[in-house]
Structures are given as structure tokens and as C-alpha cells.
């Protein structure tokens, strides 16, 4: 008898780079590059797999991270989402690929219905929608936060801005849109 494996749905984390490029050790720079955090104030949304969590913990002194909710992700997609060619992600583009709204895409990603937000072009049959948003850039360029940061040298638990901040990451993201 074959048992069907249930799909494991990992939590989705938003990771924002807060510190710049100079004096970054090579191994940290490589890990940031693999996470697609190549510039200050860029954000990626990643699943919380053990390997990704290990990478985030390695660069913990350069980033802040926490669980993103569907409303914040929909807002980020709407305001800061870009497709290849640096064109804005529009509702018409989503509807072309079978999605009805930004909220629908965000909820599908957070709940694990789709595994990735962005992908290269995929072949789909007529009437089906792809398991991602084709040609979406896998990172989001954000503004510096309104009201500023406390400290990019201290961790969040001691009054700074670096490291794990849990669901409070959503407040920071809204300040950076």
C-alpha cells in the first residue's frame, strides 16, 4: 500500500536587510546573496524550512525577520511588486495569469497553496493558473522606514532593530512601503 505524503506547510518569513555592504565578511555576504538580499532595505519572503532558518540565523546581525501576514504581503505586492523589465505588478497582469486579486495571491502563498511567489514562465493549460506569478522579481525594494530605526547594531530584544521580531515585522514593513 502506498501512503500519500502530506505536504508540509512551513511558516512564511519576511527578511529585510538593514545593514549595508562595506565590511561585510565574505561568508555573510555569500549567504545574503543566496537569500537575494543584495542591497540595504531589500526584502524577500521565504518559507521557514530548516535550511532557510539556518541561513537567516547566520546573517542575523545584518537582517531583521519575522512572520508576515497575508494582508501585509498583499500590500507589498501591490505597492512594491515588480516584474521583469522593472515594470510594476498590476492587477491586469495578475488577471492575465488567472489570479483575481493581490489578496488571493498573498493568501494562497501564506497558506501553502502555492510554493513560490515568483518563477520563470511556466506552461499551463487553458483555464488553469500557474503555481506562482510568472516573471515576478523575487525581492522587494523598500524605502527606509518612516520614523527611522532605533539601532542597526543592537538586536530587537534589547531595543535595536536586528534579528527576530515575530509578527511585529508587519508594522516595520508598512512603515517602509
Swiss-Prot record:
HAMAP family: Ribosomal_uL30_A. It holds the Pfam family Ribosomal_L30. InterPro entries: Ribo_uL30_ferredoxin-like_sf, Ribosomal_uL30, Ribosomal_uL30_arc, Ribosomal_uL30_euk_arc, Ribosomal_uL30_ferredoxin-like. This is Large ribosomal subunit protein uL30. It comes from Pyrobaculum islandicum (strain DSM 4184 / JCM 9189 / GEO3). One of its GO terms (molecular function) is structural constituent of ribosome. The gene is rpl30. Coiled coil: none annotated. GO terms for biological process: maturation of LSU-rRNA from tricistronic rRNA transcript (SSU-rRNA, 5.8S rRNA, LSU-rRNA); translation. The lineage of its organism: Archaea, Thermoproteota, Thermoprotei, Thermoproteales, Thermoproteaceae. One of its GO terms (cellular component) is cytosolic large ribosomal subunit. Keywords: Ribonucleoprotein, Ribosomal protein. Transmembrane segments: none annotated. Part of the 50S ribosomal subunit. Belongs to the universal ribosomal protein uL30 family.
Amino acid at each position: 500500500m502506498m501512503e500519500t505524503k502530506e505536504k508540509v506547510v512551513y511558516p512564511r518569513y519576511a527578511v529585510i536587510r538593514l545593514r549595508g555592504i562595506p565590511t561585510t565578511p565574505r561568508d555573510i555576504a555569500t549567504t545574503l546573496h543566496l537569500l537575494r538580499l543584495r542591497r540595504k532595505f531589500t526584502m524577500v519572503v521565504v518559507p521557514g524550512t530548516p535550511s532557510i532558518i539556518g541561513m537567516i540565523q547566520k546573517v542575523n546581525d545584518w537582517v531583521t525577520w519575522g512572520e508576515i501576514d497575508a494582508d501585509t504581503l498583499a500590500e507589498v505586492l501591490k505597492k512594491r511588486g515588480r516584474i521583469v523589465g522593472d515594470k510594476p505588478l498590476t492587477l491586469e497582469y495578475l488577471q492575465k495569469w488567472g489570479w483575481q486579486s493581490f489578496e488571493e495571491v498573498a493568501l494562497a502563498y501564506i497558506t501553502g497553496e502555492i510554493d513560490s511567489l515568483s518563477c520563470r514562465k511556466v506552461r499551463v493549460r487553458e483555464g488553469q493558473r500557474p503555481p506562482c506569478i510568472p516573471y515576478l522579481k523575487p525581492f522587494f525594494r523598500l524605502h527606509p522606514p518612516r520614523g527611522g530605526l532605533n539601532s542597526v547594531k543592537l538586536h530587537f530584544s534589547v531595543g535595536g532593530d536586528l534579528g527576530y521580531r515575530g509578527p511585529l515585522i508587519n508594522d516595520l514593513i508598512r512603515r517602509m512601503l
